[in-house]
UniProtKB/Swiss-Prot annotation:
This is Peroxisomal ATPase PEX6. Its main location: cytoplasm. PANTHER family: AAA-FAMILY ATPASE (PTHR23077), PEROXISOMAL ATPASE PEX6 (PTHR23077:SF9). It holds the Pfam family PEX6_4th. InterPro entries: AAA+_ATPase, AAA_ATPase_domain, ATPase_AAA_core, ATPase_AAA_CS, P-loop_NTPase, PEX6_4th_dom, RecA-like_PEX6_r2. Residues 346-358 have a biased composition (Polar residues). It comes from Colletotrichum orbiculare (strain 104-T / ATCC 96160 / CBS 514.97 / LARS 414 / MAFF 240422). The lineage of its organism: Eukaryota, Fungi, Dikarya, Ascomycota, Pezizomycotina.
Length: 1388
């Protein structure tokens, strides 16, 4: 293969007539033929009709002059009924046009490397097609695609092979010399270049690269054994999982050592891994202790295994002795036995039931049968088998289908008119155990759960109750599951080596074998009363008593046809609405017209309907009822979007009596009759009340198409029957479900217990209260009739007022009760809107007629007291925590069938969406889907080819088919911005720690207070108190507000800013209510920061205000009460941090500064050193363009120590303004010089013309020089004077103690041998009673209390009393000498 042929040219160059946007066409069916006689190489050939259908725009393109044809790309996949670009596993392959092939044929060589990925997919979906491809070909589906150029390819090689390539062996050994249009590249010199060149040549041997493909290396084989080297493997491709190699593709090498099997050399790459008859899973596993089991039909057990065991497919061990004479094998390849030399296991030490030479009764969960195995300790004689006339059959675990299985996949293929509801599916290996063939009639009945141990049901009265119970059974057709729908059970078979002690007999009794599974329609399972286990047995062929010689009962037989049938409406909110009647009746007609239905008296019939289509047709002015019904009946399922289900119940059935043995026929078919809509008389007999199947144990919403199916897990087959996942259920939903179940239980109805009235309250809108109630009702099978109070008010309008509103409420509630009081829950949304006085009596009357009433409100205070007192339970729906948000996100993703990238961590997304409720999380998922679509459209537009979004999805990969982590990041950021606006939080600028200069000690204290509870909540889980209040105080302009914004940005917290006037209200009690609302919003939006700016105006000292009513005092009291709950260790207030800022802490109420409130006081002052000023200048000028000659250090040396942070900001802004002014003057001067020069241009030169034609980079760049800073400094007036700064230092000393210099003087002067100490500066100036600051001068008499000293006496808490003389009395208090945040390192 030549170098020029390694990478095919892009499609855009091949065909100049290719349209810019290609239209997506549906997939076509074709046959894949593997024939190595007519075609060689990796490129396949395509029949002419397929080429014309797939590439119609290339129909008239002339061929090349040299006769060569262009390589096109198509995507193939194993045939399935409904292929999808996003869910089907496609394989992109290169093809050429051929006119010699049969129509609808794709032909490849069996040794084509392009089919490696397809063979792997086929092995998972339909392994039997691998061995039958040579006879009739493989049925596939084919699409036209454009192969994308890959950005990055990750490959894996062994270390030894990598060294050989680096040494240049791959450069000299090539299959063919390079030839073609391009010139041969230069010989690489370095080992890395030689490795890259060899890898690019090796990958170039693949026409299309797929993730997981193996590729041969350009290395010579072994000189002695002539075994080729081990191949390399493509681990990952980006941005899609398959594409072509280009010159810009990056190759990332992953080195490693591949360990071969014991006693076996590593195999070379086969021509085709799976299409040569050997399954991929078995080609490497050929160790001596590996064997294939015979057709023993043993199922997976729960026995503990170790890594030493060998995985193999096993089958059920219940031989049942003589009962299985017809258990014949079908000569599959799986039944081949690989013999090995028998070896005796090593004797186990101690007492064991596993000894050499004795019957092995238990072997790691493998259970032998008491009849077939001699000397066994098991027996089949149990209370179950001892019952007389017990029906025999096989026991299966019942599993409801999550989607219908199409008839095209079944064998034998059912008739088109056969009822799909009368089918049951089991594994093919289980058909012989039942004793029938696929498509035969069997008897299915509900069965009890088998006993958990091997002793059977030896319960009290097990043998005495011998009366046969009536079983709920019916005839159905049994079919084997199509290939790929189920995985054969895998268990661990012990190897020849004795690796561990065998289990004893009693330990083995704890191992419960899993029964085989029978898949059945969830509606049919509900008609069988939803049992957990089913028993299948063939219908006995009765002796023929009629005329003729043909047998009476065959697989083609049908139950007797019905002559007359009565259908009852199951009253539900859908069937009760007049607007949906046409859709309901049309759906019922469609249900019986499509198939010959098999029903029995009492059966439930589920009919999915499109309510939106039915309502739109019903509202047409010229709509006729019967015509609309006919239109709805003729609508195809593909064209409808089913959103509701109408339920019906079968009443009386009268069959056609054709012979005298009608009773025997009825006994044979269990009362089931065929309903042919063309010959049956169908009557409606009113309404019936009934529950629907409970959704917590049934899959009927997915089966009927009301909900989308969840995406299959990784590694699961696309056709596998998915089981119902265990959904997230919140504790409140579980509690609500229990209340509803108790209120509607037969015991509560019989005892006439009072109804249950539940009020769901919340402080958020769109939190999911109505959805919670509806889902809880669906879990137990109750109907939910929702009434919106605002809709009633809008319909009532102004005419009638309260009277009409009351009448509408009564009418809606009566309609809801017509669905059955014990089967329907009445849901009233926004009950706070019903404020009229007559509503109390109306609600009382409604409660008398119903069993369950649920109401929702977002403002419980607006609900009238009379209405609120009627509710027996009041449940608050709070904002979801992290675990609940993760569960809600997972439920949304599964309900919408969204495929997530494996790297997406829903727990991390839940952490980022703090304070968002269920409605906001739905918005997050919707935004992520939009972001994914935009990302795919952006990728397709960048390629420069006619690439559509479908081409990306067909190419596969997480980036193309899944919602990635980046999509969720974009969605979360947008949702948080919307949430911040909805709750009234201000838009926070992007302020980080880099914008805050200095303040290192403040940053450390903030980290300790805020970051520790957020990152390590387990430290505070046991009630440990945490600090949640921080008070910033100091001169104005020192960065208190800036620091609060930086805290909110750095820790991703919601930010509330509260001003003093916002809390004041003229009405009594509203000001305190505003404080409560602020903290309630903060708790709902946690983690968040509540920032009280100018706290002295919000919470001044109580008793000093002269306002009437004491409004400020009440605000302070309410604020204190809210702050007391912030430091608790429980979860009710965690994540709420309160930050206050003030420049007058002496005016605050002293109660605010006590422990548990604002107990962390941080002083933000001015910078007292030039180094601190330099840090501030660097933070403010980090986005400036400074002249290279500027030295911020020299600028800082010339600044006074009275500048605050705001002054530094003004200094830098003025310097930038001066630089811009200087640069503008320079440009004006150059323009004047140009105008003065003689030139051909007439007229003045504009500034825009100068920048377009004459400007140099120096003219555009605005650089700030040192002279600009100095000029701005000369003009700047400090905002805080030196006298004011000294006052703030005195205030700081009041709260934190004297400065460090005074402390050192005190420690020098207070060295006395006695326990009493003299306090420096203890004389106080005072003219009355009160407290004075220690450190004053003058004469007086008072007490000075020194606390927190460093000597041994002070540590014992002794008090020094200093007496003096003066004109008054006072107390001089020396504060904590090691106070909080006394270190002013890095302050402004």
């Amino acid at each position: 293969m030549t170098t020029s042929e390694l990478v095919p040219p892009p499609p855009a160059r091949r065909s100049p007539r290719t349209r810019r946007r290609r239209q997506d066409k549906p997939a076509l069916s074709a046959r894949l033929v593997l024939d190595d006689h007519e075609i060689n190489g990796d490129v396949g050939v395509l029949s002419e009709d397929l080429f014309t259908d797939l590439f119609p725009h290339l129909r008239n393109v002339p061929s090349r002059e040299d006769g060569s044809e262009d390589i096109h790309h198509v995507a193939i996949a194993p045939w399935e009924p409904s292929p999808s670009p996003t869910e089907t596993a496609w394989t992109v392959v290169p093809v050429l046009k051929s006119s010699a092939l049969k129509p609808s044929t794709v032909q490849f060589s069996p040794s084509s490397l392009s089919l490696q990925s397809f063979a792997t997919i086929l092995q998972q979906v339909a392994p039997s097609k691998l061995s039958s491809h040579s006879r009739s070909g493989i049925e596939v589906q084919i699409l036209d695609v454009v192969a994308l150029s890959l950005d990055t390819v990750f490959v894996s090689l062994e270390s030894e092979l990598t060294k050989r390539l680096e040494q240049g062996e791959g450069t000299f050994f090539r299959d063919r010399p390079n030839k073609g249009k391009g010139k041969a590249p230069a010989q690489p010199d370095t080992p890395e270049d030689r490795l890259i060149s060899a890898l690019r040549v090796a990958l170039g041997s693949l026409k299309v690269l797929h993730s997981g493909d193996l590729f041969s290396l350009p290395l010579p084989p072994h000189p002695v054994t002539h075994v080729p080297p081990n191949p390399g493997k493509i681990m990952l491709c980006e941005p899609v999982s398959q594409g072509i190699l280009s010159d810009d593709t990056k190759i990332v090498l992953m080195r490693g050592r591949v360990h071969a099997k014991r006693g076996q050399s590593a195999p070379a790459i086969p021509p085709n891994r799976s299409l040569n008859g050997v399954p991929e899973d078995d080609e490497d596993d050929t160790a001596n202790d590996q064997f294939y089991s015979a057709a023993e039909d043993r199922y997976k057990t729960d026995a503990a295994t170790t890594e030493m065991d060998t995985v193999t497919e096993t089958e059920e061990s219940d031989l049942s002795g003589v009962d299985h004479d017809d258990d014949l094998s079908d000569d599959f390849m799986d039944d081949m036995i690989s013999l090995q030399a028998p070896t005796l296991p090593t004797t186990a030490s101690g007492v064991s039931t596993m000894q050499p030479g004795t019957p092995m009764t238990i072997g790691r969960g493998r259970k032998t049968n008491g009849i077939a195995t001699p000397a066994s300790v098991f027996s089949n004689f149990t209370a179950t088998t001892a019952r007389p006339d017990r029906p025999r059959g096989r026991l299966f675990k019942a599993q409801g289908l999550i989607r219908p299985i199409l008839i095209d996949l079944l064998h034998p293929k059912p008739a088109p008119e056969d009822d799909e509801e009368a089918r049951i599916f089991v594994d093919i290996a289980s058909l012989s155990k039942i004793g029938c063939f696929s498509g035969d009639w069997v008897r299915v009945e509900a069965a009890e759960e088998p006993p958990a141990n091997g002793f059977g049901a030896f319960g009290l009265g097990s043998f005495t109750s011998l009366e046969p119970t009536e079983s709920n059974w019916r005839p159905v057709r049994v079919y084997g599951l199509p290939e790929g729908y189920s995985q054969r059970p895998v268990t661990r078979i012990p190897s020849a080596k004795h690796g561990e002690r065998r289990m004893s007999f009693f330990e083995s009794q704890l191992q419960k074998p899993t029964s085989p599974t029978a898949y059945i329609s969830p509606v049919l399972l509900a008609n069988l009363e939803s049992p957990s286990y089913l028993r299948l047995s063939p219908i006995k062929r009765g002796t023929y008593q009629g005329k003729g010689t043909l047998p009476k009962f065959t697989s083609a037989s049908r139950p007797p046809y019905a002559r007359d049938i009565t259908i009852q409406h199951v009253r539900s909110p859908v069937t009760a609405e007049r607007a949906y009647q046409s859709a309901v009746l049309g759906g019922l007609k469609r249900y019986f017209a499509q198939k010959i239905r098999l029903v029995r008296t009492g059966d439930l019939i589920a009919v999915p309907i499109d309510t939106q289509l039915g309502k739109a047709l019903q509202e047409q002015p010229s709509a006729n009822g019967s015509e609309v019904d006919d239109v709805m009946a003729l609508a195809k399922d593909e064209s409808c979007r089913f959103d509701q289900v109408a339920w019906f119940k079968v009443g009386h059935i009268q069959t056609q009596k054709t012979d005298a043995d009608h009773d025997q026929t009825e006994d044979l078919w269990g009362g089931v009759a065929c309903i042919d809509s063309s010959s049956v008389a169908m009557h409606g007999s009113g309404f019936a009340t009934s529950r629907t199947p409970a959704t917590k144990a049934s899959t009927w919403p997915y089966y009927l198409g009301v909900k989308k199916m969840p995406m299959k897990s990784n590694g699961a087959s696309a056709l596998m029957v998915p089981e119902q996942d265990q959904r997230f259920v919140s504790p409140l939903r579980r509690r609500l479900r229990e209340l509803l179940a108790a209120a509607t239980s037969p015991r509560a109805i019989h005892l006439k217990m009072p109804p249950v009235a539940i009020l769901l309250t919340s402080t958020h809108r769109n939190i999911g209260k109505a959805t919670l109630a509806s889902e809880a009702c669906s879990d137990i099978g109750l109907h939910t009739y929702a009434i919106d109070a605002y809709d009633i008010l809008s319909e009532a309008g102004t005419s009638g007022g309260d009277v009409k509103t009351e009448g509408l409420l009564r009418t809606r509630s009566e309609r809801a009760m017509s669905c059955g009081p014990d089967t329907t829950a009445l849901l009233i949304k926004h009950v706070e809107a019903l404020t009229a006085d007559r509503m109390v009596s109306t609600m009382k009357e409604i409660l008398q007629d119903t069993r369950v009433l649920v109401a929702t409100t977002s403002d419980v205070d607006k609900v009238p007291d009379g209405v609120r007192g009627l509710f027996s339970h009041e449940l608050e729906v709070g904002a979801p925590d992290e675990a609940e948000r993760e569960g809600i996100l997972r439920t949304i993703v599964e309900d919408r069938g969204i495929n997530l990238d494996p790297e997406v961590d829903l727990n991390g997304i839940a952490l980022k969406t703090a304070a968002l409720v269920a409605g906001d999380l739905v918005d997050v998922v919707d935004r992520a889907l939009v972001a994914q679509r935009l990302r795919l459209e952006q990728i397709s537009s960048k390629t420069g080819q006619a690439v559509t979004v479908r081409d990306l999805q067909v190419a596969g990969g997480a980036m193309a088919r899944c919602v990635t982590k980046g999509d969720f990041d974009v969605a979360v950021e947008a949702a948080r911005k919307n949430f911040a606006g909805a709750i009234g939080a201000p838009k926070i600028p992007n302020v980080t720690w880099d914008d805050v200069g200095g303040l290192n000690n403040v940053k450390d204290a903030v980290t300790e207070t805020i970051q520790l509870p957020l990152e390590r909540p387990e430290l505070f889980a046991k009630g440990m108190k945490k600090r949640s209040g921080i008070l910033f105080y100091g001169p104005p302009g020192t960065g208190k507000t800036l620091l609060a914004k930086a805290i909110a940005t750095e820790y991703s917290l919601n930010f509330f800013s509260v001003k003093g006037p916002e809390l004041l209200n003229m009405y009594i009690g509203e000001s305190e209510a505003n404080v409560r609302r602020v903290f309630q919003r903060a708790r709902d939006a946690r983690p968040c920061v509540v920032f009280f700016d100018e706290l002295d105006s919000v919470a001044p000292k109580r008793g000093n205000q002269g306002d009437s009513g004491g409004v400020m005092d009440r605000i302070v009291s309410q604020l204190l009460a809210e702050l007391d709950g912030m430091s608790g260790g429980d979860d009710t207030s965690g994540g709420v941090f309160v930050i206050g800022a003030t420049n007058r802490p002496d005016l605050l109420d002293p109660a605010l500064l006590r422990p548990g409130r604002f107990d962390k006081m941080l002083y933000l002052g001015v910078s007292d050193t030039h180094d601190k000023q330099l840090k501030i200048l660097e933070a403010l000028t980090r986005k400036f363009t400074l002249h290279p000659s500027v030295s911020l250090h020299s600028v800082a040396q010339q600044l006074p120590f009275t500048y605050t942070g705001a002054d530094f900001y003004a200094l830098c802004s003025d310097a930038m303004l001066k630089a811009v002014t200087r640069q503008a003057a320079s440009v004006d001067a150059k323009i004047r010089e140009l105008e003065a020069q003689p030139r051909s241009r007439t007229g003045p030169i504009s500034t825009a013309y100068f920048f377009d034609h004459h400007a140099t980079p120096e003219d555009i760049a605005v650089m700030v020089t040192e002279e600009d800073f100095l000029a701005a400094n000369r003009e700047l007036v400090p905002s805080v004077s030196a006298g004011e700064l000294s006052h703030y230092e005195q205030v700081r000393a009041m709260f934190e103690g004297p400065p460090e210099k005074d402390r050192q003087q005190q420690q020098q002067q207070q060295q006395r041998p006695s326990g009493l100490r003299a306090v420096s500066g203890s004389s106080v100036v005072s003219k009355g009673k009160g407290k004075a600051i220690a450190g004053g001068s003058g004469k007086g008499k008072g007490k000075a209390v020194a606390t927190g000293s460093d000597d041994e006496y002070g540590s014992e808490g002794e008090v020094a009393v200093v007496n003096g003389k003066g004109k008054g009395k006072g107390k001089a208090v020396a504060g904590f000498q090691d106070g909080t945040a006394s270190d002013d390192e890095g302050l402004y």
